Structure formats: C-alpha cells, structure tokens
Design a protein with these regions (language model features):
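Auxiliary Fe-S-binding modules of radical SAM enzymes
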Residues: 1-5, 14-16, 207, 214-290
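Conserved C-terminal portion of the radical SAM core fold
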Residues: 159-220, 236-259
Length: 290
C-alpha cells in the first residue's frame, strides 16, 4: 500500500506532510553520544529545507502557503522532521506538538526520532496524543548492520531499534511506526540492503521509507567520497534494488517513500536524485508491476 492510499483510506481525502522544526538537537551531536553526528547528516539534520522559526503555528501557516496550490480541500500532517524530536524537555516538546495540532486542517502529527530516544515519558505523551489524533513516529534505522552503523557513526545498535518498536507496539499500539532505511551506504552490498528491509518488516514496522544515499557538503561522507573510498549507486542500480525490496514488503506495510533528496545547493552527488520526473516515472512503473 502506498502512503497516498493509506492516508486516503484513513482520512478520506488527500493529505500532505508539512515539515516543521521544533528546535531540537540530537544525542549524537550534543556530546551525549558524539559531537559529530552521522557521517551523512548535514548541519541542519534532515530538515535542510526548513527555515527555523520559534513559533510553531507560524511555521505551519507558512508551510501550508507553500503547498496550498498542490492540495485542494485536503488536510495536512505536521511533520517534526529536524534532528531528534523526542530528545529534550518532553513538556516543551509536547506543547509544540499540540501547537501544531491546534492549527486548522491539521489531520495528525509525524515525529522523527532515534530508536534510543523512546523512554517512559515519551510513551506517556504519545499515548495521550494517539487517543485524540493520528500519530506517526518515524525511526531512523538506516541499516540493520551494526558494522555499517559503526562506520556511519549512528551511535546505537540495531537491537535498540527492535526494542523501540516492541515497546511502541506494546504501549502505544495506535501509533503508526515508520522505519527509515538508506540504500547505498558505504561498503554495503545488495544483500545487506535487502536484509535491512526484511529486518524492519520482521520487527513489525507499520511503514517504511527508502532513499538512496546522497553526499552533502561539509560532512564526513563528503571527505570519504572525494577521496574515492566508496561509490554511490547509479539510478539503475538503486531502482533495481528497490524493485527487489518491494517484492518482500507485505501489502499491509505502508510504503511512505522510495526516493529522497537534499538541498540542491548543498548536494555533491548523485545528481540523478533531482530528476524527480524521471524518478517518479520509474517508481510508478515499479509499483504497477509489484
């Protein structure tokens, strides 16, 4: 099931995600686990497109204006995307989540975080929220390989992801859990990439996001790439692996994304990720034959 089909089924109309910035940091950046972050992560985390503003309601309204021509009579998911959005003062975070939910036409909330940042306080707030609205929690697994996890400076074990999904399923069953996976991480072969997908499926993730690795300026990954320590996936190879991945993803797991990109001005490679028309055409063909 595609995410558009899932949202249409749940809300009865078109739903568009708008990205917000809660001003969070990450235990992999503030010194709790590391100061450098994951080797592929830009200075603004995954929210490179989001201009930071303290006022959440203002962020929502500005984001809606950007996409309002694309969505008629639709609703929005408020997506707290940047860095680790369950890491910090939970009362402050909870207030920001509710500020977004109080805005007009917001159908639910999506929260991006790490598997090692789900504690009892977070579970309590997620439980309260999920009783009154749709809640989507997005976990950045990236790979099931701890060897690769160490290389990319992920700073958590894959077993911590399994534990996180388990406690989410047990304590907040209404929450829709989405798992992020990256294809093309340094030195991973096709078998490992597909193993990461199966790992998430076996953990009972509700949804999955897959993207090809891209290199941003001023990252450790950029240095590795320029020194030719690894190769990036070609478009053909990437979508070949995606097609195989879709064969092992069951129908009840929602496919939230099959490609992704960073800010063009900050991206070194691969440039094919910006050819969205061609990429979407390939994705539609793959899904049609699934």
């Amino acid at each position: 099931m595609t995410v558009n089909e899932f949202y249409k089924q749940k809300f009865g109309r078109k739903v568009y995600k708008i990205s917000l910035d809660a001003g969070c940091t990450c235990p992999n950046r503030d010194g709790t686990k590391s100061y450098s972050g994951c080797i592929f992560c830009g200075q603004n985390g995954s929210g490179d497109f989001i201009p930071f503003q303290e006022n959440i309601r203002l962020q929502v309204e500005n984001a809606k204006k950007i996409v309002e021509n694309k969505i008629k009579n639709g609703k929005y998911i408020a997506y707290f995307q940047n860095f680790t959005n369950t890491y910090g003062d939970i009362e402050i975070l909870y207030e920001k989540w509710n500020q977004a939910l109080s805005c007009e036409d917001i159908a639910g909330i999506a929260i991006g975080t790490r598997p090692d940042c789900i504690d009892s306080q977070v579970l309590e707030k997620l439980s309260i929220l999920s009783e009154k609205t749709f809640v989507q929690l997005e976990l950045g697994l990236q790979t099931s390989s701890d060897k690769t996890g160490f290389l990319i400076n992920r700073q958590f074990f894959s077993s911590e992801y399994l534990k996180a999904v388990s406690i989410l399923k047990k304590n907040v069953p209404r929450v829709h859990v989405v798992t992020h996976i990256i294809f093309g991480l340094p030195f991973e072969d096709e078998k490992q990439m597909l193993s990461s997908v199966k790992f998430a499926i076996d953990a009972k993730t509700d949804g999955i996001k897959i993207a090809s690795l891209y290199v941003l300026k001023n990252t450790v990954l950029e240095k590795m790439y320029l020194e030719k320590k690894f190769s990036l996936l070609s478009r053909e190879k990437y979508f070949s692996i995606v097609e195989k991945a879709l064969k092992i993803i069951p129908e009840n797991v929602v496919i939230h994304r099959l490609t992704g990109d960073g800010p063009k001005s900050q991206t070194i490679a691969p440039l094919w990720i910006f050819d969205k028309k061609q990429n979407l055409s390939i994705i539609n063909e793959i899904l049609k034959n699934k």
